[in-house]
Amino acid sequence: DVFYIGGTKVGALFGEAVVITNPNLLLNMFSLVKLHGALLAKGRLLGIQFGELFRDNLYMEIGKCAVQQAQRIKQAFLAQGYEVIVDSPTNQQFFRLPNEVMDRLKESATFELWGPRGKTHTMVRFVTSWATREEDVDKLISLL
């Protein structure tokens, strides 16, 4: 019924677009957002960047590189025998890594812990964006 589309990973300054597919939920949406303090004073300006990103499939074109690089990361981790937590077709990839591998990678790579550190393994998230270069992914893969 409701989902959101992020903007920063495709070059937007900030913000997310909320998509409501169930028209019954639209009835009081503006009032609810305003009531809970989530309405930005000039929030309509955020919509301009999404309007442009959605024109002529630009959002998908910009995001294509990020998704391709994320899939390369996933395939490299799988080839090394690491566990994929979520089989994600997006620019976000989730793995369960041995702590010694995670500790070694964090010296040279940026990623996020996706939960508390376990005794032997920890879940992590790697995220690519429009700015992720092929050579950056090559370097990460070489560290595996």
Residue ranges and their predicted role:
Residues 1-90:
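Active-site C-terminal subdomain of aminotransferase-like
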Residues 71, 76-144:
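Conserved C-terminal alpha-helix-loop-beta "cap" of PLP-dependent enzymes
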